[in-house]
């Protein structure tokens, strides 16, 4: 469960999941995902990590809808028998998205078009907490800290603190700061280029969310000042734990899913 929680955290910290579906991410991989730039966190999602969560959600959905009589394992076995073996026999036997969806519905006996529309072709958040619950697992954000920040990422470049990413909708983005700007000072105090991310966080910790600060930057050798309203730079840290009020049926479902006894 720890590994699943890590994947959930990796996906939930990316803003691109609201912009790009995993179907689009897969299609655009060679022209976008493997050619990342400063706007990548705002625009793209990994079809590897989020794709694994969609597969998890599909597995749990099938298990719930069939009383644990069917799972994603049954779907994968059917795909192998109908298509996979032909590949190793030297036969070209591809499969379309529509055919794959039809097999999933056939094996599970469930109507899953809404699932496909929302989570494969859409950017709707996966209701993982809701799906985990019948398996006796609770999903909670353990990070309750309120941290004032600019919603940027910085790195050291020579003696400069350079802004590498500006997260869309964040404090710096609303103020007008851009990726590539050299961050000089906050309220007249120099931002050190020595371990800049840590030092910037420490410098901003003196403030509260909602306070205004003056950020000074160089943009192509032009000195610029921006008034920034600090926002809560919350980084989720989801954890998965066994539910305190689990029932015997929840425990049984979890054991069938994880294929282990407790």
Regions found by a protein language model. Give the residues of each.
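C-terminal recognition in membrane/secretory proteostasis and scaffolding
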Residues: 2-262
